């Protein structure tokens, strides 16, 4: 491809509303353009990259036995009402009416549609297992679209759905898809981690997320430094570093603390070590009108997903209001503690191993210091309530936990029978009796992968693409292309490289565009291999080669260029 025949839409300045590096560089490199909040047009340069992601995804899905389909993006409300999600989904579900006043939505996901297809097409266990996928535009009406493609409203997604007569078959396909996802991200050259995850609003019983590691990531990715254990922050089990509760050394005492409304003030003004403090958080119970106290160490954070899974706690988690606290306890949030508390109490594992610690006295501006379990108050229910922190023991007993930032680019679920029961999707089993189908679902954010790859690989000059993702593998940059000798050599090399199967962008802009601008544009776009043709080099029988990640260029004999690139460029 020649730049004279291409939309080379690079920009020197960074748009003011672009915050994250992928958004900045995709705009500057001429990959995308903003149409409206959370909506982007893919320009030719960006679309070439996304098509490469799609191709790898499609190859691995096909190799895993999945069949490609294409479902409508507009879905009838009846299906969502049948599954119960029409009422459950919030305003991120874009709802509309047609001219006949029938309700529809723009699909954020396709569980209902695929289950409707399966119940109409499948009748016997002999047709199973069946795994179908699509690469389709999705829409979620995010309240605050931001970060470019990282959190837009419209996006491209690969979503697959599998149907099974039993759990063993589902597990087999789930494992195959897990491997297929690992293959996809490995082939794309990404540093990623698959992690155990909570099933969230999709539902189901078992899931894994796939995260591209990047400092700009929104999610914490937890993994062991000595094993393959990995989980997201919602799912990671918190194991206390302590194994035995120390014996008491202090007496219980009631202390005036008008200057300690927070843990930080308690530590600063009263000399307590933060690991000797606790936070008592009051939440609404599963039973109407009931409150429950959750207690974590002062330096730990409550994990709301874990807490909401307690049978006595309302799901989703709802914190008690100040009025509810006053009515039930008679004190404000900064003075609460588990001693003499007229509520059911659940404490974190780490709290159960504390001694000589400080708690709120359930009286405004007062705390108890020197508190000890069993001596001063009984040990209540103990549960895993907190987020893990770096250095915690790995739950599998091997090594300690490391925390990195990650960008979620894939998610796989074992849905079980959640949707098939709701939509009555069943077949005749081997014994001739109806069997409700078990389902799996498997998503990859195709457009998000492009942005995540940039977040993982860039420098102050621009994007650094690997060979698998680059829009073009080779940038061919002639200096003084208007001269016969340079033009003839360049055109001949361009023909040879394209005939050999390389993806080449020939920068044939005229002499009004300086070599410096040409080099800067190619580095901004991130093309991994650059060949410079100049009259001076040709006089010596050489071209100039430079890889995007290298500082210095090297001379390359003209008659060795093809062999060199065939060995260097990964295809």
Curated annotation (Swiss-Prot):
Q: Recorded E.C. number(s)?
A: 6.1.1.15
Gene3D superfamilies for the chain: Anticodon-binding domain, Bira Bifunctional Protein, Domain 2
Q: Does the keyword Lyase apply?
A: no
Report the record's Gene Ontology biological process terms: prolyl-tRNA aminoacylation
Where would one find the signal peptide in this protein? none
Listed A to Z, the keywords are: Aminoacyl-tRNA synthetase, ATP-binding, Cytoplasm, Ligase, Nucleotide-binding, Protein biosynthesis
Q: Which GO terms describe its cellular component?
A: cytosol
Any idea where this protein resides?
Cytoplasm
Q: Which PROSITE patterns match?
A: AA_TRNA_LIGASE_II (PS50862)
Tell me which InterPro entries the record gives. aa-tRNA-synt_IIb, aa-tRNA-synth_II, aa-tRNA-synth_II/BPL/LPL, Anticodon-bd, Anticodon-bd_dom_sf, Pro-tRNA-ligase_IIa, Pro-tRNA-synth_IIa_bac-type, Pro-tRNA-Synthase_IIa_type1
Q: Which Pfam families match?
A: HGTP_anticodon, tRNA-synt_2b, tRNA_edit
GO MF terms here are:
aminoacyl-tRNA deacylase activity; ATP binding; proline-tRNA ligase activity
Please write the reaction equations for the catalytic activity of this protein: tRNA(Pro) + L-proline + ATP = L-prolyl-tRNA(Pro) + AMP + diphosphate
- Written domain comment of the UniProt record: Consists of three domains: the N-terminal catalytic domain, the editing domain and the C-terminal anticodon-binding domain.
Complexes and interactors: Homodimer.
Q: Family, per the entry?
A: Belongs to the class-II aminoacyl-tRNA synthetase family. ProS type 1 subfamily.
Q: What HAMAP family does the annotation carry?
A: Pro_tRNA_synth_type1
Its biological purpose: Catalyzes the attachment of proline to tRNA(Pro) in a two-step reaction: proline is first activated by ATP to form Pro-AMP and then transferred to the acceptor end of tRNA(Pro). As ProRS can inadvertently accommodate and process non-cognate amino acids such as alanine and cysteine, to avoid such errors it has two additional distinct editing activities against alanine. One activity is designated as 'pretransfer' editing and involves the tRNA(Pro)-independent hydrolysis of activated Ala-AMP.
Name under which the protein is recorded: Proline--tRNA ligase
Q: Which organism is it from?
A: Pseudomonas putida (strain GB-1)
- Gene transcribed to yield this protein: proS
């Amino acid at each position: 491809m020649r730049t004279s025949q291409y939309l080379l839409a690079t920009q020197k300045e960074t748009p003011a509303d672009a915050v994250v590096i992928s958004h900045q560089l995709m705009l500057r490199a001429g990959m995308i353009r903003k149409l409206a909040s959370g909506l982007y047009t893919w320009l030719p340069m960006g679309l070439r990259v996304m098509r490469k992601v799609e191709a790898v995804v499609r190859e691995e899905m096909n190799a895993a036995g999945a069949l490609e389909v294409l479902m409508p993006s507009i879905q009838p409300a009846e299906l969502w009402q049948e599954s119960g999600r029409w009422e459950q989904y919030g305003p991120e579900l874009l709802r509309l009416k047609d001219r006949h006043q029938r309700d529809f939505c723009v699909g954020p996901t396709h569980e209902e549609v695929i289950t409707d297809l399966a119940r109409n097409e499948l009748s016997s266990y002999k047709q199973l297992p069946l795994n179908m996928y699509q690469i389709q535009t999705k829409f979620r009406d995010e309240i605050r679209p931001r970060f470019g493609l990282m959190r837009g409203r419209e996006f491209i997604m690969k979503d697959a759905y599998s149907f099974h007569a039993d759990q063993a078959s589902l597990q087999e396909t789930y494992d195959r898809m897990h491997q297929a996802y690992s293959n996809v991200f490995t082939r794309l050259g990404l540093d990623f981690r698959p992690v155990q995850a909570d099933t969230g609003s999709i539902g189901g019983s078992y899931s894994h997320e796939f995260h591209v590691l990047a400092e700009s990531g929104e999610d914490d990715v937890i993994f062991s430094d000595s094993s393959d254990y990995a989980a997201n922050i919602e799912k990671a089990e918190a194991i206390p570093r302590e194994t035995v509760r120390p014996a008491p050394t202090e007496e219980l005492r009631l202390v005036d603390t008008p200057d300690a409304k927070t843990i930080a003030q308690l530590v600063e003004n009263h000399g307590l070590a933060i690991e000797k403090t606790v936070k008592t958080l009051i939440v609404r119970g599963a039973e109407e009108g009931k409150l429950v106290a959750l207690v974590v160490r002062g330096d730990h954070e409550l994990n709301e997903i874990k807490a909401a899974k307690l049978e006595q706690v309302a799901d989703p988690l709802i914190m008690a209001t100040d009025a509810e606290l006053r009515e039930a306890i008679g004190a404000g949030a900064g003075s609460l503690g588990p001693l003499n508390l007229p509520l059911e109490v659940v404490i974190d594992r780490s709290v159960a191993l504390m001694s000589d610690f400080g708690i709120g006295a359930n009286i405004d501006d007062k705390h108890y210091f020197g508190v000890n379990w069993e001596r001063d108050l009984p040990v209540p229910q103990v549960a895993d309530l907190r987020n893990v922190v770096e250095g915690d023991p790995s739950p599998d007993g091997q090594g300690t936990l490391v925390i990195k930032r990650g960008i979620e680019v894939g998610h796989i679920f074992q849905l079980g029978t959640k949707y098939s029961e709701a939509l009555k999707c069943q077949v005749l089993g081997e014994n001739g009796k109806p069997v409700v189908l078990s389902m799996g679902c498997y998503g990859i954010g195709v457009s998000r992968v492009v942005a995540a790859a940039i977040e993982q690989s860039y420098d102050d000059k621009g994007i650094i693409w690997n060979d698998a993702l680059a829009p073009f593998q080779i940038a061919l940059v002639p200096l003084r292309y208007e001269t016969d000798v340079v033009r003839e050599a360049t055109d001949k090399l361009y023909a040879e490289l394209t005939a050999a199967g390389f993806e080449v962008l020939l920068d044939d802009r005229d002499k009004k565009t300086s070599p410096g601008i040409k080099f800067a544009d190619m580095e901004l776009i991130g093309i991994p291999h650059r060949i410079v043709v100049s009259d001076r080099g040709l006089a010596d029988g050489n071209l100039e080669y430079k890889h995007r990640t290298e500082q210095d260029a090297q001379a390359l004999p003209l008659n060795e260029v093809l062999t060199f690139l065939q060995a260097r460029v990964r295809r």
